[in-house]
Amino acid sequence: MFAVIKTGGKQYRVAANDLIKVEKVAGEAGDIVEFAEVLMVGSTIGAPTVAGAIVTAEVVEQGRARKVIAFKKRRRQNSKRTRGHRQELTTIRISEILTDGAKPSKKAAEKKAPKAAPKKAAAKAESAE
């Protein structure tokens, strides 16, 4: 089953376990976020949204897009302006598509335990001794 959600002024077609990059969403890696603005679920089209439909997702990482250069030049005036912009993005993994006001499963509701320290740092410390 698929759904169409709206976030950050854009619409995304999503299905369970999809990994997508969206405009910045508040939350850290491992947090669960819910999207209530569901425009379509399967063959059900909302007017404007599907009542009682929620899409849950897990935040995988917070990041930034590639730099976009905005260059303006005024001809014959020796005048130019260069500015750069990097959009903040959030990578999310779609957990569930819920309809009819269903609650998220316990698996989606639980937060993941923090990861252990990287092994590379421990290996460097041992080789230095």
UniProtKB/Swiss-Prot annotation:
One of its GO terms (cellular component) is ribonucleoprotein complex. Residues 100-129 are annotated as: Disordered. GO terms for molecular function: rRNA binding; structural constituent of ribosome. Keywords: Ribonucleoprotein, Ribosomal protein, RNA-binding, rRNA-binding. It comes from the Bacteria. It holds the Pfam family Ribosomal_L21p. GO terms for biological process: translation. PANTHER family: 50S RIBOSOMAL PROTEIN L21 (PTHR21349), LARGE RIBOSOMAL SUBUNIT PROTEIN BL21M (PTHR21349:SF0). HAMAP family: Ribosomal_bL21. Part of the 50S ribosomal subunit. Contacts protein L20. This protein binds to 23S rRNA in the presence of protein L20. Belongs to the bacterial ribosomal protein bL21 family. This is Large ribosomal subunit protein bL21. It comes from Brucella anthropi (strain ATCC 49188 / DSM 6882 / CCUG 24695 / JCM 21032 / LMG 3331 / NBRC 15819 / NCTC 12168 / Alc 37) (Ochrobactrum anthropi). The lineage of its organism: Bacteria, Pseudomonadati, Pseudomonadota, Alphaproteobacteria, Hyphomicrobiales.
